A protein has these predicted regions:
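Glycine- and acidic-residue-biased ligand/ion/polar-headgroup-sensing regions
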Residues: 35-49, 65-66
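Short beta-strand segments in beta-sandwich/barrel cores
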Residues: 19, 28, 45-50, 68, ...
Length: 222
């Protein structure tokens, strides 16, 4: 996360602000902090979860190595960042990191870029949940994962998903049964292949993007 050309004293200053977290799969990287935090996910994968009344949970976003993640302090809802696989992360107090970053344009640029990416993904997700069918939602999810963690395999793309189908369902506002049914339909249509519970091959990215309701002019290449 830090600029590669950062002077030693600058590097030490940033490192002093953060605390290292090494967490096993299922563990809490950040949980209901009293202040807003920014988390750099150095390795692994995680989910940002919001908690509402009556023990209701919502998977807000999935995150992967290299992401800078904003975890709000409890307000209308409480939040936690939970590891989907063994993960290493550095947790910063958001206000302090932002204050120090004002003196270091490269770091501030990294934070702004991360904020822009998060805003874009949030807008896309609001469209997916608000306007799209179950089939389109699942196709959108697969395309999104392909862009972020997909492994090219010729004209195909392989996904090794760290999240459960329950997590996917919660993220998309669907049931587990609907997720399984839609994956089965996409498999039957020749758009994907599945292996076990976590490996999915995307066989036709252009057709899958069309299935997701993407505009034709948008590129479906990884």
């Amino acid at each position: 996360m830090l600029p590669s050309v950062a002077a030693d004293e600058v590097l030490a200053h940033f490192e002093a602000l953060g605390r290292l977290r090494i967490v096993a799969s299922g563990g809490s990287i950040v949980a209901e902090e009293s202040e807003d935090t920014l988390v750099y996910l150095a390795s692994g994968a995680a989910k940002l979860v919001a908690f509402a009344s009556q023990d209701r949970e919502q998977v807000v976003a999935f995150h992967f190595a290299g992401d800078l993640i904003s975890v709000p302090a409890p307000r209308a809802h409480a939040y936690a960042l939970l590891a989907l696989r063994a993960s290493e992360a550095i947790v910063f107090p958001a206000d302090e990191l932002l204050s120090v970053s004002h003196e270091h344009p490269a770091m501030m640029g990294r934070i702004i870029c991360s904020a822009y990416t998060s805003l874009r993904r949030s807008r896309e997700k609001s469209i997916v949940i608000g306007r799209k069918t179950a089939r389109e939602r699942v196709a959108c999810f697969l395309i999104s994962m392909a862009e972020r963690i997909g492994l090219p395999e010729g004209n195909r793309c392989v996904l090794h998903l760290p999240m459960s189908r329950r997590d996917i369902a919660d993220s998309l506002g669907l049931t587990i049964e609907t997720i399984s049914r839609q994956l089965g339909d996409l498999r039957g249509d020749g758009l994907i292949e599945t292996s076990g519970r976590s490996t999915i091959r995307l066989l036709d990215l252009a057709a899958l993007a069309a299935c997701a309701g993407h505009l034709i002019k948008q590129s479906s290449q990884i």
